[in-house]
């Protein structure tokens, strides 16, 4: 960490504190969007890996089943899930399925809720970072959040119903899934695509060498929800959109925050909301940044897979699982306090801001406005002195005092040898 404050500036909920010149994540405020791990110039923030724990599970002889996020297609440059499934079998997994089958049940639940007309507005609950954002920072919008499990949890419940004794591991590009899995109690671990790449390399598994191998009688079935990881993907999972709502996709932290701030002014709007710009294909642990074309190419690959899938494969037949997908999303207190006006003025005065004209709102400290900075100081998230104009003014003032009180004659010249300053001794 080199005092650049880029992570503070970029964090949508200001869940980062700066103490002793080090930026640290405030766990209770973090929504686990993972954005700070991507934009840190020094790579000072890393994602905790569960790889060693999963290795122990795989080596224990337990029946381990993987639930694989459909964005694997773009991250690993594949066009067939069977290739990934074979690779997982080589690692010791008993079986693997696409999380999209759980997403299909989620879409069905959304359809039922939309047709009931009980929601003024409707926000999808597939993204755990969005759910956390609403729970902790926009609790008034909880009335619009779909009371439905995420696709990962829905699929885990399906697998648990079929294999009660199995260990279930989710594989995907999302950091927020780690907390969601831990809180659910039905998922035994989460591996990111970064973890999988490391594991494949460690075991000398080359996906390109598996491409031409097929699993006899093991072809996957078509599923509209395989488009979930891209922007507008949830909308594509509906065979027909229920009438009565305007449907739109909102992705990226800034657009999500903007939508939530204004949602009370909307009516009959369905919001497919993802914290990651362009959807899960651009998740913090996706590998799309390593491919030419980035998230746009990744979106194209998933779309191609989705279209080919529904065109060539038999529709997936869902048996009656008897699974309850209802989910309550309670409000979460984030423990920050709004400072009284007198405290704001007192904090600003300490750094030479005595009037509104002194509040430059330059954003160098990581906060959009000087008053936002005062809020952070009041809550103990940063130091008041971390203010570029204040530090510059103080440094210039100190330099002036040193020059004027030096026992030596001092003359300051610019690069063209014009005199800029001279003390009394000079």
Where are these regions (language model features)?
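Short, flexible, mixed-charge glycine/proline-rich loop motifs
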Residues: 1-3, 29-30, 267, 350-356
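Conserved phosphate/pyrophosphate-binding and hydrolysis machinery centered on Walker-type P-loop NTPases
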Residues: 78, 363-367, 413
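Sterile Alpha Motif
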Residues: 378, 388-393, 397
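Sensory modules in modular signal-transduction proteins
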Residues: 395-426
